[in-house]
């Protein structure tokens, strides 16, 4: 009997010890994760743009370049010493921005007008031919479209659905395909030359289910996984790939006009983005980052702290989008009434 008691005590002691070790390891891992998050978000410095050939005659390609975040990428890259290929829909806007950058930043520019809702394989073959021979080291995949207003998938028009997928997915892949072959050729010619960068704009909608923006959310989730896959494929060839996710940014697409702690201006967001290349902020997924500090905090909190509560967050996102939809519908009704008066 005494032997059985001793055996039971020994077994219980082993179980307690095992759980204690597990608890200690879990605590250490959580603390390490938190410390890494704090360091990368608030203290670490990203890869310098000189690594990609800034001020050495190399070129950056920016899509969706004439408004909002895209315009800021083009402007800040030009001010950092890159010549810039500007791609957007409206030639008049392209010409105005090109003139501005040539005057202010003293760089070379090229403009290419592309309506990403109407592209074909021939569009991107022509783009590739137009860019062959240009020493491109940076591609910013910024062009994108969201829903006109939050709408259930059942009520989303076929045109809006197709445009979102055509621009965000088809357009981004084909633009990257056209530019990547040029980058690879440059790297093969000069392995000791600057590295190359492919940076694609993602969204929080791709991190977390976004009811009433379902098509847009799906397109951004696709870009996250595609970027991570591509990043692993080309890293040994001297090409860095990142998907930068943002929460809301003041822009025409977000329909937000005033900046807040969590909603930066395009200038602030892009400044944070270009200074945090190479830093995996706000999450654990490789090649994916939330470069703006408050966005990184939000993302890390969702990933590390909420766990099963993510379902509650999704329901709150749905409620927020429904509220936005109601306000948009009221505004439309008000404008319609004014026009009829």
Curated annotation (Swiss-Prot):
Compartmental location: Endoplasmic reticulum membrane
UniProt keyword terms in alphabetical order: Endoplasmic reticulum, Fatty acid biosynthesis, Fatty acid metabolism, Lipid biosynthesis, Lipid metabolism, Membrane, NADP, Oxidoreductase, Transmembrane, Transmembrane helix
Database matches in Pfam families: adh_short (PF00106)
Binding site for NADP(+): 61, 115, 142, 177, 216, 220, 249, 251
GO CC, alphabetical: endoplasmic reticulum; endoplasmic reticulum membrane
UniProt-annotated catalytic positions: 216 (proton donor), 220 (lowers pka of active site tyr)
Broad class of enzyme this protein falls into: oxidoreductase
Alphabetized PROSITE patterns for the sequence: ADH_SHORT
Gene3D superfamilies in the cross-refs: NAD(P)-binding Rossmann-like Domain
Residue spans crossing the bilayer: 15-35
Catalytic activity: a very-long-chain (3R)-3-hydroxyacyl-CoA + NADP(+) = a very-long-chain 3-oxoacyl-CoA + NADPH + H(+)
Enzyme Commission number(s): 1.1.1.330
Single GO MF annotation: very-long-chain 3-oxoacyl-CoA reductase activity
GO biological process, one term: sphingolipid biosynthetic process
Membrane topology of the entry: Single-pass membrane protein
Pathway: Lipid metabolism; fatty acid biosynthesis
Domain of life: Eukaryota
Protein function: Component of the microsomal membrane bound fatty acid elongation system, which produces the 26-carbon very long-chain fatty acids (VLCFA) from palmitate. Catalyzes the reduction of the 3-ketoacyl-CoA intermediate that is formed in each cycle of fatty acid elongation. VLCFAs serve as precursors for ceramide and sphingolipids.
Family: Belongs to the short-chain dehydrogenases/reductases (SDR) family.
Protein name in the entry: Very-long-chain 3-oxoacyl-CoA reductase
Species this protein is from: Schizosaccharomyces pombe (strain 972 / ATCC 24843)
């Amino acid at each position: 009997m005494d032997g059985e008691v001793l055996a039971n005590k020994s077994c219980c002691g082993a179980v307690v010890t095992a759980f204690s070790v597990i608890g200690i390891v879990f605590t250490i891992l959580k603390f390490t994760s938190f410390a890494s998050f704090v360091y990368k978000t608030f203290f670490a410095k990203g890869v310098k743009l000189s690594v990609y050939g800034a001020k050495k005659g190399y070129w950056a390609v920016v899509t969706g370049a004439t408004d909002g975040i895209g315009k800021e990428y083009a402007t800040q890259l030009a001010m950092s010493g890159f010549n810039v290929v500007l791609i957007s829909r409206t030639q008049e806007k392209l010409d105005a921005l090109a003139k501005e950058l040539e005057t202010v930043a003293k760089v070379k520019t090229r403009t290419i007008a592309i309506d990403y809702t109407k592209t074909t394989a021939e569009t991107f073959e022509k783009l590739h031919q137009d860019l062959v021979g240009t020493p491109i080291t940076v591609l910013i995949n910024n062009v994108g479209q969201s829903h006109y207003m939050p709408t259930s998938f059942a009520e989303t028009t076929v045109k809006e659905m197709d445009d979102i997928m055509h621009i965000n997915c088809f357009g981004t892949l084909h633009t990257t395909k056209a530019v990547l072959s040029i980058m690879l050729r440059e790297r093969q010619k000069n392995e000791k030359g600057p590295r190359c960068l492919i940076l694609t704009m993602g969204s929080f909608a791709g991190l977390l289910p976004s009811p009433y923006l379902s098509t847009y959310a799906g397109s951004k989730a696709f870009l996250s996984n595609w970027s991570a896959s591509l990043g692993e494929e080309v890293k040994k060839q001297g090409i860095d790939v990142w998907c930068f996710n943002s929460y809301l940014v003041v822009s025409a697409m977000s329909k937000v006009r005033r900046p807040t702690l969590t909603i930066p201006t395009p200038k602030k967001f892009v400044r944070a983005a270009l200074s945090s290349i190479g830093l995996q902020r706000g999450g654990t997924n490789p090649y994916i980052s939330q470069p703006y500090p408050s966005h990184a905090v939000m993302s890390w909190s969702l990933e590390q702290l909420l766990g099963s509560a993510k379902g509650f967050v999704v329901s709150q996102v749905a409620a927020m989008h429904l509220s936005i939809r109601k306000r948009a519908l009221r505004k439309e009704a008000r404008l319609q009434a004014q026009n009829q008066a």
